[in-house]
């Protein structure tokens, strides 16, 4: 390829020669062209520059003043205020220093070795790489913060001393200077605090971005056993919960935690210098509180670690429920899974409640500790015989106020690091799991791809031995735990192949055809390095590989993007690929041709269409080595032949191809054939295997054709018609291919959408929303009592300050010091009791709300129509159960209580100041108007940004979930870097919302700090010059004003944070209100028949379709058009037709997964719309096209309701030819199955287990949708005879492409282009000029060629 490119390039001398020869002739034309081009280019460049300017972060080009005041974010704030909403496209990009491709380089697995014997290596490395090396400003600002904390009480002392002077010694200028110093210290201290938050946010965002990237990159490298351990749900929890814990810690506590002890020591020295040795009493109280705080912190951390484990379990089961919802609905197993999730939720809530009790204890300690220090210090000071002086009391109170803030913050920092430790362990453990070792050796000029003496196993022994995870430590079912433990030990050395030799000639077709479960897929996975190689060598594997998995991996994007898979579009070659993969005619069934979104996992496509899209991707990649695992199993014979001729033997010719297939009619075309038997490989050419090994392929093919008897007299007449049909088909293809373009109209692009945009609430969070939240957790009376307790508690707190002024003034002259002390301590005790009551009430509301919301959410999701799951990615839905429920469980009620506390503290504080000095009411009213207006402007932008942030989180989870399901395909195509790039883009979109939100918070904080400092200045001026200058109350007003400044900022933040957390509630609440299935048009008006009247329904198994039409969504073309047919009791009906014709839709209609848009379906004369869905689905049986198993055991997958004894299960396992396999497993029926049977059973074995599940239930009416498509011919024949013998009294609809499976049916239904074109006895159809005859004729022609 490179050589050809070099040939086509012209040398520089040739190029310049050509120019000189043509220069004179074309000079004028070139000048004209250049002029035209230059105008177009200028316009295009202007547009590009404008676009870049709009998306570029305004901070990059902001002035110094704009950066200090965050004026650069004003434009976005105003835009949000005017629009009353924001979209993600309105938000500018994050600056380069926050982009994922930059931050992800800070920590890499190469730099960072996560060893289990190294404690907290992740935390340590983050400190080194993110703070010491990248954000040293944090340390400098923290120094300034300590300095201003120490200066504030000293300035206040000077101010108080000034007020104590006699009037003749006071100077107005000096007084104003002191007021100015109070303003300056207040504003500078607050400003330093804000910049500490800002740089902490930058560190936090970088840590979040980096860890998310690191976890995603690791997920793309997981070994197979690690994939079983860490499914998509667990990795989702790592990102949505554990990474968030890291982010929160490094935002607010990362540097503070080191400076706080020094800050506390300096403040204590100041206190002791002010009150003497009495300060040591306060110090002693602080020292005593540390071990108590430590105990509560450790217990909270332990419970949090347990909580995360139970959350993992619940989210994993919920993820399995969401991913398997189509099958769960068909089997009517919703209640089974809901009970399982409910049990796990109960365990989670139990831990949440126990953790809540310790949380209550630590909250009480945090809120009373500082007050207790103050009381102990001042009481000791008084009892020591010291007179309570005004300057001493209020300076000490100011110092103790700073200590109070520290004593509140320090435990939170400690608790946050204690909660960080479990997250640190979990992330480190994940990052230390074994990675896939794709140790393939490329040999130049090799003639074969080979395995020499290869030994392979699925299980990673090291992982099993070192993995002592606690997933089962807390299970109630000890028996299950014991079973799982035994199984792990037994299966550690479960080798798939031992000392095998394999070869595939370069540039040739190698076919692997063996019985079901023999190891065909395992051999393919060995060649691409997906299973562990213990011994031997793999040689000759090229660098560029294409791979089609047995269960196709498709992304929730357009059909085109799934085929291109990151490659550039070559429109002509692309059209050839569509034709070769027989996808051209399918495009007419899609609403927007190849631009149509096909949904998560290709939900919008049939099984055959999925396989062909996967095959088209492999072909389009133009790789040297193509591995295909059963790409022909779900397509009809005509399409299979087309794919083999045009694709596998056509466009793929001269490439190295390995094809796994049960389509044995193609065996004679193979250059090399591989048969796997009992773990050994027999290989050679068709002739070698026939002559040397005695394998009679011809007799197998002949047996397969024995039932397909054709009337020879009609055969010749059809050949002419076939040729005419082929010509028409080619003309039709040409017409469709002409419609395929590089770019499409906007109208068609709109039609292409399958996934709906995520719902988002607009405008402010209404009072009704808050009311709804509290409705779930309390009554109106209970809520009123809670609010009242909060208000009384804060009034009592303020009363303690008033009492201090009374004490210093000795207002009650006749009373002793003991009286003042007793009253002071009594106020403290009452305050303590009220704190306990108010937080107990709040905790109860939060717990009840959490429980009820989750229960309603999972019930609502379980009843939602299947179209909801088709149009919403699983990651988006799962985000409600992980991130949003986590917010409601752990954060919502904290925010609520803090917001209430700050609001009431501000109200009580302002009334206190106005009571002391009524003249302050005027400036307060003016400043309140400013505050209210600024807050309103800010609130809109930050609310909308947080909504955008929540919405932008879902694509991260959805994309992660998709990638976890397609790891082998991504790795085979070597697409890891592209997928990392896509994930980085998703992270950056989420991060830009977060960054803008933080910038907006800084914008308002700085402006509020200025307003707050102005309040301090005004109140201090009034206290000097209003006639109360010698009163303790005037000093109290200044002290109160100083405390209000911090409350104003905190209240503003907490109100917005609460509104942000309410966004999680809104999202959950919206899902709670989803419409239930069966409530669509034409259903509500019909009355349901009671279950009592349907006790033995269906008795006969008659089916009647009357003019049935089906549309999956409003944009789609009908999947079934005017279908009318009747099935009598016990009849066996075969349903055939081209892949994608609408066969599986018939099954979906019967189970009411999709409602008929027209017509009706009757079973035993009863319209199925009048039957309860659970009753309808529970009465029918199905073997789905895609086999689905849930995590559990063999037994629980066959009999989840525990209705049958072991003997019966073994009998049915023998029927489906699985008894031998399962009886050899160490725990037999109790052998563990992971989600969807991955690494435990082959695809064909999973199909047989699903068949067993259906047969043991023995329903009157059974639908078999390609039930044996992935099993070998002999097994299929055996099962066919078993069904014929045992299901004589059952009505069976069999959808199949393999005609030998359905040729003995009573009737054949032929579906073509969504219509029923034939419905007749197979013999009559074969002996007439029918479509079915042509299908049979075509298959026979292929197999006997």
Swiss-Prot record:
Coiled-coil residues: 21-55, 709-739
InterPro entries named among the record's database cross-references: AAA+_ATPase (IPR003593), ABC1_TM_dom (IPR011527), ABC1_TM_sf (IPR036640), ABC_transporter-like_ATP-bd (IPR003439), ABC_transporter-like_CS (IPR017871), ABC_transporter_C-like (IPR050173), ABCC_6TM_D1 (IPR044746), ABCC_6TM_D2 (IPR044726)
Biological processes per GO annotation: slug development involved in sorocarp development; transmembrane transport
Transmembrane segments: 139-159, 172-192, 246-266, 268-288, 356-376, 402-422, 776-796, 817-837, 906-926, 1008-1028
Domain ABC transporter: 481-703, 1103-1338
CDD domains: ABC_6TM_ABCC_D1, ABC_6TM_ABCC_D2, ABCC_MRP_domain1, ABCC_MRP_domain2
Region: Disordered, residue numbers: 460-488
Alphabetized GO MF terms: ABC-type transporter activity; ATP binding; ATP hydrolysis activity; ATPase-coupled transmembrane transporter activity
Subcellular compartments: Membrane
GO cellular component: membrane
Domain of life: Eukaryota
Compositionally skewed regions (Acidic residues) per UniProt: 462-481
Keywords of the record: ATP-binding, Coiled coil, Membrane, Nucleotide-binding, Repeat, Transmembrane, Transmembrane helix, Transport
Residues involved in ATP binding: 1137-1144
SUPFAM superfamilies hit by this protein: ABC transporter transmembrane region (SSF90123), P-loop containing nucleoside triphosphate hydrolases (SSF52540)
Residue ranges of domain ABC transmembrane type-1 in the record: 135-419, 775-1060
Membrane topology: Multi-pass membrane protein
Family statement drawn from the similarity comment of this UniProt entry: Belongs to the ABC transporter superfamily. ABCC family. Conjugate transporter (TC 3.A.1.208) subfamily.
Protein's recorded name: ABC transporter C family member 9
Name of encoding gene: abcC9
């Amino acid at each position: 390829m490179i050589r050809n490119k070099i040939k086509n390039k012209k040398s520089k001398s040739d190029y310049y020669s050509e120019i000189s020869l043509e220069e004179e002739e074309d000079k004028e034309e070139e000048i004209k062209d250049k002029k035209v081009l230059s105008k177009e280019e200028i316009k295009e460049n202007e547009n590009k520059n404008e676009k870049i300017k709009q998306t570029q972060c305004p901070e990059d080009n902001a002035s110094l003043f704009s950066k200090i005041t965050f004026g650069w974010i004003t434009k976005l704030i105003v835009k949000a205020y005017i629009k009353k909403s924001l979209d993600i496209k309105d938000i500018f990009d994050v600056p380069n220093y926050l982009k994922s491709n930059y931050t992800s380089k800070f920590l890499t697995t190469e730099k960072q070795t996560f060893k289990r014997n190294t404690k907290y290596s992740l935390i340590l490395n983050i400190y080194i790489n993110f703070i010491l090396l990248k954000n040293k400003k944090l340390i400098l600002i923290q120094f300034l913060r300590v300095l201003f904390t120490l200066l504030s009480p000293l300035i206040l002392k000077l101010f108080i001393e000034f007020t104590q002077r006699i009037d003749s010694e006071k100077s107005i200028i000096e007084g104003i200077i002191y007021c100015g110093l109070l303003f300056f210290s207040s504003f500078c201290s607050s400003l330093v605090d804000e910049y500490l938050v800002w740089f902490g946010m930058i560190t936090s965002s970088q840590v979040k971005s980096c860890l998310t990237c690191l976890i995603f990159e690791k997920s793309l490298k997981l070994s197979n056993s690690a994939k079983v351990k860490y499914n998509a749900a667990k990795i989702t929890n790592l990102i949505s919960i554990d990474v968030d814990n890291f982010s929160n810690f490094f935002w607010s506590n990362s540097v503070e935690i080191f400076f706080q002890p020094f800050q506390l020591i300096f403040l204590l020295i100041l206190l002791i210098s002010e009150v003497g040795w009495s300060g040591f009493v306060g110090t002693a109280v602080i020292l005593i509180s540390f071990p108590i705080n430590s105990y509560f912190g450790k217990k909270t951390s332990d419970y949090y670690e347990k909580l995360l484990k139970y959350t993992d379990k619940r989210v994993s089961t919920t993820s399995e429920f969401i991913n398997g919802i189509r099958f769960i609905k068909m089997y009517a197993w919703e209640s089974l899974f809901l009970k399982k999730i409910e049990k796990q939720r109960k365990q989670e809530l139990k831990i949440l409640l126990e953790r809540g009790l310790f949380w209550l204890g630590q909250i009480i300690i945090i809120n009373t500790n500082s007050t207790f220090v103050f009381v102990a210090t001042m009481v000791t000071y008084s009892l020591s015989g010291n007179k309570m002086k005004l300057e001493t009391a209020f300076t000490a109170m100011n110092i103790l106020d700073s200590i109070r803030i520290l004593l509140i913050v320090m435990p939170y920092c400690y608790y946050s690091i204690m909660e960080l430790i479990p997250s640190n362990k979990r992330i480190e453990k994940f990052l230390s799991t074994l990675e896939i070792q794709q140790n393939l050796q490329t040999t130049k000029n090799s003639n074969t791809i080979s395995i020499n003496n290869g030994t392979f196993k699925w299980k990673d022994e090291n992982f099993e031995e070192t993995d002592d995870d606690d997933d089962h430590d807390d299970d109630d079912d000890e028996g299950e735990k014991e079973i799982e433990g035994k199984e792990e030990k037994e299966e550690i050395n479960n080798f798939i192949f031992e000392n095998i030799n394999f070869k595939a000639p370069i540039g040739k077709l190698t076919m692997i055809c063996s019985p079901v479960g023999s190891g065909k897929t395992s051999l393919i996975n060995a060649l691409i390095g997906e299973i562990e190689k213990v011994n031997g060598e793999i040689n000759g594997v090229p660098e560029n590989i294409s791979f089609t998995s047995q269960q196709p991996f498709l992304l929730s994007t357009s059909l085109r993007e799934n085929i291109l898979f990151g490659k550039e579009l070559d429109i002509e070659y692309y059209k050839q690929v569509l034709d070769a993969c027989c996808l051209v005619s399918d495009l007419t069934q899609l609403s927007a041709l190849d631009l149509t979104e096909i949904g998560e996992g290709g939900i919008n496509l049939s099984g055959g269409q999925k396989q062909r899209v996967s095959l088209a991707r492999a072909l389009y990649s133009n790789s040297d080595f193509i591995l295909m695992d059963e790409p022909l199993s779900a397509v009809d014979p005509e399409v299979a032949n087309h794919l083999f001729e045009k694709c596998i033997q056509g466009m793929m010719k001269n490439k190295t191809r390995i094809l796994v297939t049960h389509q044995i009619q193609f065996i004679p075309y193979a250059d090399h054939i591989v048969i796997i038997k009992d773990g050994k490989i027999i290989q050679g050419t068709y002739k070698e295997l026939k002559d040397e090994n005695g394998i009679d392929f011809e007799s197998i093919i002949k047996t397969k054709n024995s039932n397909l008897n054709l009337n020879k007299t009609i055969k010749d007449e059809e050949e002419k018609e076939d040729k005419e049909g082929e010509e028409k088909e080619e003309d039709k293809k040409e017409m469709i291919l002409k419609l395929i373009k590089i770019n499409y109209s906007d109208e068609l692009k709109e039609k292409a959408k399958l996934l709906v945009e995520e719902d988002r609430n607009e405008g402010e969070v209404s009072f009704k929303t808050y009311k709804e939240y509290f409705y779930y957790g309390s009554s109106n009376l209970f809520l009123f009592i809670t609010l009242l307790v909060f208000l009384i508690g804060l009034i009592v707190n303020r009363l303690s300050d008033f009492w201090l002024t009374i004490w210093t003034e000795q207002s009650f002259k006749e009373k002793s010091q003991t009286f003042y002390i007793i009253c002071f301590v009594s106020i403290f005790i009452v305050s303590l009791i009220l704190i306990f009551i108010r937080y107990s009430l709040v905790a109860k509301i939060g717990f009840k709300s959490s429980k009820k919301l989750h229960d309603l959410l999972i019930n609502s999701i379980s009843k939602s129509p299947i179209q909801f799951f088709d149009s919403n990615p699983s990651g988006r839905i799962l985000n409600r159960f992980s991130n949003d429920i986590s917010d409601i469980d752990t954060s919502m009620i904290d925010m609520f209580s803090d917001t209430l506390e700050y609001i009431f503290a501000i109200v009580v504080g302002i009334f206190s100041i106005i009571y002391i000095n009524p003249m302050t009411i005027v400036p307060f009213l003016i400043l309140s108007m400013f505050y209210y207006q600024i807050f309103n402007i800010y609130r809109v932008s930050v609310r909308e940004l947080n909504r955008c942030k929540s919405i932008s989180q879902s694509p991260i989870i959805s994309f992660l979930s998709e990638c976890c399901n397609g790891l082998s395909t991504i790795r085979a195509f070597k697409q890891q870097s592209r997928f990392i790039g896509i994930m980085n883009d998703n992270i950056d979109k989420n991060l830009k919302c977060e960054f803008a939100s933080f910038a907006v918070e800084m914008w308002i904080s700085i402006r509020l700090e200025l307003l707050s400092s102005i309040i301090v200045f005004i109140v201090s001026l009034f206290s000097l010059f209003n006639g109360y200058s010698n009163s303790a109350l005037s000093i109290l007003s200044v002290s109160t004003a100083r405390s209000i400044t911090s409350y104003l900022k905190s209240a503003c933040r907490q109100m917005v944070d609460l509104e942000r957390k309410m966004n999680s509630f809104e999202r959950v609440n919206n899902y709670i209100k989803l419409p239930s299935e069966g409530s669509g048009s034409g259903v509500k008006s019909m009355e349901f028949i009671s279950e009592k009247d349907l006790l033995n329904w269906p008795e006969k198994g008659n089916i009647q379709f009357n003019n049935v039409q089906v549309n999956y969504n409003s944009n789609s073309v009908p999947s079934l058009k005017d279908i009318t047919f009747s099935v009598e009791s016990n009849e066996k009906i075969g349903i055939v037709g081209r892949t994608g014709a609408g066969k599986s839709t018939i099954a979906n209609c019967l189970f009411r997964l999709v409602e008929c848009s027209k017509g009706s379906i009757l079973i035993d004369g009863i319209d199925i719309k009048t039957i309860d869905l659970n009753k309808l689905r529970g009465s029918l049986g199905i073997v789905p096209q895609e086999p689905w198993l849930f995590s559990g055991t063999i037994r629980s997958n066959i009999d989840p309701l525990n209705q049958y004894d072991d003997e019966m299960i073994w009998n049915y396992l023998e029927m489906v030819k699985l008894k031998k396999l399962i009886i050899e497993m160490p725990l037999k029926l109790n052998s563990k199955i992971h989600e969807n049977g991955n690494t435990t059973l082959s695809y064909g074995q999973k199909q047989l287990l699903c068949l067993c599940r259906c047969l043991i239930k023995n329903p009157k009416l059974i639908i078999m949708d390609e039930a044996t498509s992935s099993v070998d011919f002999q097994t299929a024949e055996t099962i066919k005879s078993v069904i014929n013998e045992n299901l004589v009294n059952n009505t069976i609809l069999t959808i199949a492409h393999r005609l030998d499976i359905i040729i003995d049916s009573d009737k054949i239904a032929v579906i073509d282009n969504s219509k029923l074109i034939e419905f007749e006895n197979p013999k009559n159809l074969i002996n007439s000029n029918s479509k079915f005859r042509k299908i049979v004729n075509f298959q026979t022609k292929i197999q006997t060629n």
